[in-house]
Each structure stands twice: as structure tokens, then as C-alpha cells.
UniProtKB/Swiss-Prot annotation:
Family: Belongs to the elongation factor P family.
Subcellular location per the Swiss-Prot or TrEMBL entry: Cytoplasm
Species the sequence originates in: Chloroherpeton thalassium (strain ATCC 35110 / GB-78)
Any one biological process term the GO annotation gives: peptide biosynthetic process
InterPro entries, sorted: Elong-fact-P_C, NA-bd_OB-fold, Rib_uL2_dom2, Transl_elong_fac_P/YeiP, Transl_elong_KOW-like, Transl_elong_P/YeiP_cen, Transl_elong_P/YeiP_CS, Transl_elongation_fac_P
Pfam short name (any one): EFP_N
Single GO MF descriptor: translation elongation factor activity
Function according to Swiss-Prot or TrEMBL: Involved in peptide bond synthesis. Stimulates efficient translation and peptide-bond synthesis on native or reconstituted 70S ribosomes in vitro. Probably functions indirectly by altering the affinity of the ribosome for aminoacyl-tRNA, thus increasing their reactivity as acceptors for peptidyl transferase.
Protein name per Swiss-Prot or TrEMBL: Elongation factor P
Amino acid sequence: MATTSDLAKGVILRFNGNLHILEEISHHTPGNKRGFYQAKMRNLRNGRIVENKFRSGEAVEIVSTERRKHQYLYQDGLDYVMMDGDTYEQLHISNELIGEQAKFLKESMEVDLVFTTDGEIIQAEVPVFVELEVTETDPTTKDDRANSGTKPATMETGAIIQVPMFVQNGDFIRIDTRTGEYIERAKK
């Protein structure tokens, strides 16, 4: 069993019977007292943030995981169907595992699935940057392009994000899936 000194950001551990991913960890040594670790963790089932203090040297259960790339095929109701490129096995992933990033999923996109050693899927990660086509946005005039500002644009996946005034229908843009923000125009 691991101890608190093995904890680091991104580690998945079992806490109070649920799987959590460690978001932040810091060590504190107040005055002449024993040191402790202050941890901020995200529950992988419901997404809630949990904070806890661990004593230095306390035993914790770190979960062994395996990360595998899968190809996104299509949406089936509330589930997303992914295919393993090696075995061609198709998996149905629930909407809760992908979360807000689902709006950036495009057919044939590679998605990282995180499995426990028991074969349970605990996390699905969309690539950090994706390139999508703008399918609908307001036309701009020459005066609008001179001004700085943003306008809403609908992507090919249905996601609506704010883009600069110079972006037109048919443009390909790069988006940060963590924040849902425009990064730059893609070179296509």
C-alpha cells in the first residue's frame, strides 16, 4: 500500500470507497506539530470536489490504471461508441464520463480511455486541442473586422463558441477543449 509521500497531481486513488483524481496536493508543517498533506480531489463518479487532510506517512490506496487510445465512432442515445483500433472491440461510454468535452467530439477522433486493472472505464479524455469547421456564424462587414470583439459561431459538432470577428463560415479553427475557447485559425 502507498503512503501520502507517493501522492502527486493526476494520481487516481480510492478514498471513502470512491475513485478520485488528485487535482492539487501540498505539504504543510505547522510550527512544532506533525506535517500533513492538504489534498483537493475530484470524484470521478459525480465530478464533485472533495478536500481532505492526510497525516504524513498515512496509508492511501493508489489505483493502478492503464490508458488506451480509442476511436470515436458515433453517438447512440446518451452513450458514445468508441472502438479499440487493435481489437476492433466497440465500447459504449456514458455521457457522464466525457462530460462537457463531448460537444467537441468528431467522428474518427482519437479519445484516451483510462481503465482500472479490473477493466472498468473510469475516465475519457478528448484531445486538448481540436480543429473544427465553422458551419454557421454571422457575416461581418469591413467595419466589423476592424473592431476587436467576438461573435458566436456554431461548429460542425454543434458546439457554440465565441470567435473573433474575422472568422467566416467554412473556416477551420483550433479550440482548447478544456476551456472551450478559440485559439487560432487552423491551416487547412
